[in-house]
Swiss-Prot record:
Belongs to the RNase H family. Its cofactor is Mg(2+). It comes from Treponema pallidum (strain Nichols). It catalyses: Endonucleolytic cleavage to 5'-phosphomonoester. PROSITE patterns: RNASE_H_1 (PS50879). The keyword Hydrolase applies. PANTHER family: RIBONUCLEASE H1. This is Ribonuclease H. Keywords: Cytoplasm, Endonuclease, Hydrolase, Magnesium, Metal-binding, Nuclease. The keyword Ion transport does not apply.
Amino acid sequence: MNAHAALTLYTDGACLGNPGPGGWAFALVPSDVPFLETGQXAPEAAAFTRSGSAYPSTNNRMELCAVINALQEAHGRAAEAVVVVTDSQYVRKGITQWIHTWKHNGWKTAAKQPVKNKDLWEALSALADALSVEWRWVKGHAGDPYNELCDRLATDAARRAAQSTADCP
């Protein structure tokens, strides 16, 4: 991965009820920002952040919206390589393992059921295919500074979701 082009994108989604009001957030951390230890508070000024909401939604749709919006931002910055850090195994395994089978099976699961959130998976796949992406999983609510920042921003967005317009389908 080209260190000069690499951005680290932390993402998170939240839903108050499932389904219910949902929020998503990402933090874009340039490669020149110093590493933060577990438990340190991530200064919002050290990262570019964005959040949005949808109502009604689900936690999985919000996780996907967070990554889609983060990758759109990376594309807008002409990034060639990114690291995506998510606490969602659904997103990480979906994009690195399951999606290949879904596409091969005509967007059906191994159980022959339609893939949920196909619209978002297709959007994510197109964005990810245009970049060099390294996918990392981090345990949620375990003190990772930027994961905690995204969690807070996504939860705040979910709280506002009932009064706002949707930022992601």
